[in-house]
């Protein structure tokens, strides 16, 4: 299949591995400690483990898993807000599938559905708008979630609802932005990153230029990467080449998809419907300035937070859950005390174990870790062979 098979060629992967090993030998920092490369996107984390790329690379290269999974960074209080909205009389609450199982303080949306709330999984905000047209006597709320990748479809759905005069449709907006998040990570004293693999899908919308501050102000290389094995290996090679040459720049490995200027139509829709919040709360990362968006006043009639009662309470994560440390790259998923024991994909306590893009789920499903050898740092039984 074009653009798939050629990016999974094992011969080329081995060639790239050899060249990566040679580059690492040229980087002085790698002689003192492992090079820490953050893959921002949860899709990259999943691909790294699915294809066994971590096992291909030298010990001197260490992936740090970033906060690029929107379901995973959703604070518990916002999940409770979703449940409160879903349980109001006459409401049909619609959401993407991953969000159904994210734990709130008492239950998940899936459990609220089992208790009688009308919660429905959709594949697009347009599905929610269709439900609103078909059920004019009901209030249909769409749970808007995701980075700039999903913002355009949400914005265009709100524009369509206004154009068609659909008054029983509203949006519970939890969209978040990637650039302030990366800046917050770079400003964190807990991390000492050497470079970044930039997100592919977000960059398709925003382009490559917004990342220039990473190279210009923080002197860190960043390479926008695709999602196939050779995409990630080549992007890593490009990051290491910058480090070996003592330079920092924004480079685009995913040029077959990502233009430097992004998608102007998508950006126009985002800017028409949304504006930046002063701050937004992230699970595990706390409050980050200008890291979320809200609906502009011109579209207030479609804002569920203005049309319905929303508790909007700040709720701390369970003490045993270490999603925050994992999201910041301070610990690896298997170093969490409840990984693989109390917290599994079947019974997740933390959001990182819920989504297929979450780092904990990726480690659990593809990490090739002998959990039985981690007792004291992580519980659980031996469910896969160690490598």
Describe the residue ranges of each PLM region.
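Metallocofactor- and cofactor-centric catalytic cores in central/energy metabolism, strongly enriched
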Residues: 1-137, 151, 155, 159-164, ...
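Internal helical hairpin/lid segments
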Residues: 234-325
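Phosphate/pyrophosphate-binding betaalpha-module
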Residues: 143, 147-210
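Short, surface-exposed amphipathic charged segments that create phosphate/polyanion-binding patches used
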Residues: 78-81, 133-140, 184-189, 211-213, ...
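Active-site-adjacent beta-strand anchor residues
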Residues: 122, 143-144, 225-226
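A conserved active-site cap/scaffold subdomain adjacent to cofactor or substrate pockets
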Residues: 172, 190-259
């Amino acid at each position: 299949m074009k653009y798939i098979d050629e990016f999974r060629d094992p011969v080329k992967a081995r060639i790239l591995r050899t060249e990566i090993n040679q580059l690492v030998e040229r980087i002085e920092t790698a002689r003192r400690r492992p090079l820490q490369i953050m893959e921002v996107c949860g899709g990259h984390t999943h691909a790294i483990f699915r294809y066994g790329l971590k096992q291909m690379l030298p010990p001197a290269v260490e992936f740090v898993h970033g906060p690029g999974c929107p379901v995973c960074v959703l604070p518990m209080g916002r999940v409770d807000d979703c449940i409160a909205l879903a349980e109001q009389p006459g409401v049909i609450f619609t959401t993407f599938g991953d969000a159904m199982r994210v734990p709130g303080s008492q239950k998940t949306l899936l459990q609220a559905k089992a208790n009688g709330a009308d919660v429905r999984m959709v594949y697009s905000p347009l599905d929610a708008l269709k439900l609103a047209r078909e059920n004019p006597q009901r209030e249909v709320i769409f749970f808007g979630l995701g980075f700039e990748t999903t913002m355009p479809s949400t914005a265009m759905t709100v524009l369509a609802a206004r154009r068609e005069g659909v008054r029983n449709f509203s949006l519970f907006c939890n969209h978040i932005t990637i650039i302030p998040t990366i800046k917050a990570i770079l400003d964190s004293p807990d991390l000492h990153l050497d470079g970044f693999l930039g997100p592919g899908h977000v960059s398709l919308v925003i382009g490559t230029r917004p990342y220039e501050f990473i190279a210009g102000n923080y002197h860190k290389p960043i390479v926008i990467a695709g999602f196939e094995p050779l995409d990630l290996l080549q992007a890593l090679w490009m990051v290491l080449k910058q480090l070996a040459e003592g330079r920092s720049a924004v480079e685009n490995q995913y040029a077959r998809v990502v233009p430097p200027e992004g998608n102007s139509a998508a950006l126009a829709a985002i800017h028409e419907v949304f504006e930046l919040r002063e701050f937004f709360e992230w699970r595990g990362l706390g409050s980050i300035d200008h890291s979320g968006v809200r609906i502009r006043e011109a579209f207030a009639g479609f804002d569920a937070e203005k049309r319905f009662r929303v508790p909007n309470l700040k709720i701390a994560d369970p003490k045993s859950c270490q999603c925050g440390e994992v999201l910041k790259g301070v610990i690896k998923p298997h170093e969490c005390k409840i990984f693989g024991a109390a917290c599994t994909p079947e019974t997740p306590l933390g959001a990182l174990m819920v989504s297929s893009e979450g780092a904990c789920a990726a480690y659990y499903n593809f990490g090739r870790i002998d959990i039985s050898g981690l007792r004291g740092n992580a519980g659980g039984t031996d469910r896969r062979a160690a490598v």
